[in-house]
């Protein structure tokens, strides 16, 4: 689930009426905006949209025309919401470049990925506030927005429930079995992961059991096509499938993932600042890792550089050496005190807590 989905679920659980607009997808429906009647969730109305014809071209070459076309979408969405929107939480400035068209009482622009372009700048200017999980984005756009909020990623309730139980029971196992298990979650066909480093790490550590969760094929993958899933990613995936000490779990539900990750002794985060859309400055998976309490061996992550929650390295060589050192000293790195520190941080950033922070922020606007 994406952050916006977790936020929608949490808001609905609080009794708010949420109108969740899906990303545009082609369908046989004659309308370009319509309610998805196939999904029934209390307090949530799912709204499907279809792509604007030649939308990318129009957005960049004829922004005025695109703005008029997308206005019809906003008008229909607002009508479905009863022609009254208290708060618009916009996560998609690539499509909705003029959020004021919705006529919401408050408009919040959430930039969780570092999108660039004049259309994003325009959306920032129209928003009442800008919210992001990384200062990389805020530093670039905050002059264009009015107030802004740096907000960490949220932790899903499935992870939080297990973390709270572990704190309650003082359940801080250093190592789950004789063979050390190291975990990684994420789309293996998305650019961003340092696959060269990951391959070297796996080859140099045959004594370690590596576990990967997430999409591991083009089918049912949220990568839009082979053009995004480069040959490098596909070659890396084939390498993983052929490695005897690698376990591929595929896609799991949030609840399943939260349970299965508890069996790990350590986690790795190895993104490339050159290929990751957010310059490897943050990731929601880190918060999920932290909720298990187990040590995280990572490349540089700017949003965590000052809190000592990750064991970070400056370059590939240092990462490999750090990995060896940490695994040889799990008693130290997975001590009860270290695990509790990580879990406490994760529990301070549940989606429930983030919504409370957003609500306090909105009251200042």
Which sequence ranges carry the predicted segments?
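Carbohydrate-associated surface elements
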Residues: 136, 153-154
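Nucleotide-sugar-dependent
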Residues: 2, 255-260, 267-290, 297-308
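Conserved donor-binding/catalytic core segment of Leloir-type glycosyltransferases
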Residues: 173-193, 199-202, 210-213, 347
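N-terminal subdomain of nucleotide-sugar transferases
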Residues: 1-33, 202-209
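A charged, aromatic-enriched C-terminal amphipathic alpha-helix characteristic of glycosyltransferases
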Residues: 167, 332-364
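Acidic anion/phosphate-binding donor-loop and adjacent secondary structure
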Residues: 118-122, 155-174, 178
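Nucleotide-activated donor-binding/catalytic signature segment of Leloir-type glycosyltransferases, i.e.
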Residues: 214, 223-258
């Amino acid at each position: 689930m994406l952050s916006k989905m977790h936020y929608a679920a949490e808001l609905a659980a609080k009794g708010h009426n949420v109108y969740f607009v899906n990303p545009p997808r082609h369908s046989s429906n004659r309308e370009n905006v319509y309610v998805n009647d196939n999904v029934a969730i209390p307090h949530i109305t799912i709204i499907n949209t279809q792509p604007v014809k030649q939308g990318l071209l129009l957005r960049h070459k004829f922004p005025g025309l695109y703005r008029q076309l997308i206005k019809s979408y906003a008008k229909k969405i607002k009508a479905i919401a009863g022609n009254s929107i208290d708060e618009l939480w916009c996560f998609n400035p690539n499509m909705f470049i003029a959020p004021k068209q919705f006529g919401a009482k408050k408009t919040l622009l959430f930039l969780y990925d570092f999108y660039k372009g004049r259309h994003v700048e325009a959306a920032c200017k129209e928003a009442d506030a800008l919210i992001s999980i990384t200062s990389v984005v805020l530093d670039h756009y905050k002059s264009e927005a009015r107030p802004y909020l740096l907000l960490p990623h949220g932790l899903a309730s499935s992870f939080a429930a297990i973390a709270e139980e572990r704190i309650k029971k003082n359940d801080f196992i250093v190592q789950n079995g004789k063979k050390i298990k190291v975990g990684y979650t994420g789309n293996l066909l998305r650019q961003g992961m340092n696959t060269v480093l990951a391959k070297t790490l796996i080859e140099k550590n045959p004594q370690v059991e590596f576990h990967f969760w997430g999409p591991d094929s083009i089918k049912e993958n949220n990568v839009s096509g082979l053009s995004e899933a480069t040959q490098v990613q596909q070659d890396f995936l084939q390498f993983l499938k052929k490695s005897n000490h690698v376990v591929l779990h595929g896609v799991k539900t949030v609840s399943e993932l939260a349970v299965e990750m508890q069996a790990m002794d350590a986690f790795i985060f190895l993104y490339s600042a050159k290929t990751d859309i957010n310059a490897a400055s943050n990731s929601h998976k880190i918060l999920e890792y932290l909720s298990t309490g187990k040590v995280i061996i990572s490349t540089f992550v700017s949003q965590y550089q000052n809190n000592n929650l990750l064991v970070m390295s400056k370059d590939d060589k240092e990462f490999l050496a750090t990995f060896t050192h940490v695994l040889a000293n799990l008693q130290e790195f997975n001590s009860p005190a270290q695990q509790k520190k990580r879990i406490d941080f994760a529990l301070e950033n549940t989606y429930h807590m983030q919504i409370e922070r957003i609500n306090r922020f909105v009251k200042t606007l």
